Amino acid sequence: MEQFHGTTILSVRRGDKVALGGDGQVTLGNIVMKGGARKVRRIYNNQVLVGFAGGTADAFSLLDRFEAKLEKHQGNLTRAAVELAKDWRTDRLLRRLEAMLIAADATTTLVITGNGDVLDPEGGICAIGSGGSYAQAAARALAENTDLSPREIVEKALGIAGDMCIYTNHNRIIETIE
C-alpha cells in the first residue's frame, strides 16, 4: 500500500532569527490528496519549531516521540534529537518509519533522519523533502546575495521550489523564532 508523500520543508537561520517553513501538499502516488496540510508546527511551549517530510502517519508518530523527548530533557534540542535518533535506529518498529524532521529553537537547527543522523546544517540553511534541493539552493543564493530576513528567504525559496517540484505547492506555512 502506498503512503502519503511529497513536501518541501526549509529552515533558514540568520543571526538570532530562524524561520522554518513548508508547503501544504500531500500526495498519494501521483494524486494530490490535500493541498493545505500543516507540516510545520510549534512544540514545547512554542519554543521549538518542527517540520516533517515523508510518510504522514510516520511523521506524526515521530513528532509525538520527539515532543516527549523534549519534555524529558527539559527542552534541550540536541539531546532530545540524539535520543530520538537512537531510538529510531534501534527500535524494530520505529526503524520502519519513513520520514525526516527539521527541528529548530532559538540557537540550534538540526536535521533528524531514520538512519540515526542528527545533522547541524552548514551556513544555517537546510531542507528536506521532494523539493528540498530546489529550496535549499534558492535559499543559499538569497542568503548570500541579499539582506532578506530568514522568513523572507524561506517564503521566496519555497515559492521557487513550488514552481519546480510537482510534489510541492504554493500553500505555505512559515513559523519564526526571533
UniProtKB/Swiss-Prot annotation:
Keyword Cell division assigned: no
Keyword terms, alphabetized: Allosteric enzyme, Cytoplasm, Hydrolase, Metal-binding, Protease, Sodium, Threonine protease
Highest taxon, organism lineage: Bacteria
CC annotations in GO: HslUV protease complex; proteasome core complex
Catalytic center residues: 7
UniProt-annotated binding residues for Na(+): 162, 165, 168
Regulation: Allosterically activated by HslU binding.
Subcellular location: Cytoplasm
Primary location group: cytoplasm
Gene Ontology molecular function: metal ion binding; threonine-type endopeptidase activity
Acetylation recorded as keyword: no
Enzyme Commission identifier(s): 3.4.25.2
Catalytic activity from the UniProt record: ATP-dependent cleavage of peptide bonds with broad specificity
Membership in a protein family: Belongs to the peptidase T1B family. HslV subfamily.
Subunit structure: A double ring-shaped homohexamer of HslV is capped on each side by a ring-shaped HslU homohexamer. The assembly of the HslU/HslV complex is dependent on binding of ATP.
Name recorded for this polypeptide: ATP-dependent protease subunit HslV
Species whose genome carries this gene: Burkholderia mallei (strain ATCC 23344)
